[in-house]
Amino acid sequence: MAALNELKDIVVEGLVSDIFKMERAYHILSVIGSNADQLNDRALGNFGELFGAFQGSLEVDAVLAVARVYDSPSKQYPTRCLRRALSLMEDRVAELPEIAERYNTKLSLAFLGENSSVVGSVDLGRDAFVARFVPAFREILDSEAVSKAVDSLKYVRDKRIAHNEAAEPHGPTWEALKSLINHAQNFVGVVGWAFFNTVYVHDGAYFLSDDAQRPSRALRRLVERIRVTGRGDR
């Protein structure tokens, strides 16, 4: 089951890890942004510079995480990315096990549309499913919206983060990054049910998103404590 172990490594150590990093960064940054007035208030401790530094690091973390998910496969440096996972499934389908959880695999394919032929292929077995799922998912990755967002993402990574070139940072919006990560979550959800019998997506919700929000909840509590303590000192 070398192919299964390799696929699981790409998904667990690559995609799942980077999805978590992006979501964690996004939620922490959201809390910092929504509490900027309090964090910059001199009377409450003047923590603006501290959290400004956190912001810069978290933004880089988020960009790099999503960029890794959408990296191009490399024979020299095997990347844990969506396209490598798709190629592995396609090229080594005979080495993968039969679909472990057909019912939930079909439910997790809802993002493709109820009438998708991919959903019906699950009941036909592993070979038929992979033969239809891989092209369908590649079609998503090759869509104009995704291609445009990925190009913008890699521009920021290569020109501004990796090399610090004197170029205008035409980066993707947070909504675009969230959309890119949502595609990755959908992929992980399908493969998790199909080949690992592992729950990543249930009833349309990505299970680990709640864990990714825990640091931001802690930050909200910290901001509230700063606010209360500051009021008491006045």
Where in this protein do the model-derived segments appear?
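Amphipathic alpha-helical interface segments
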Residues: 1-149, 172-234
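Histidine-centered, metal-coordinating catalytic motifs and their short helical/loop contexts
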Residues: 143-169
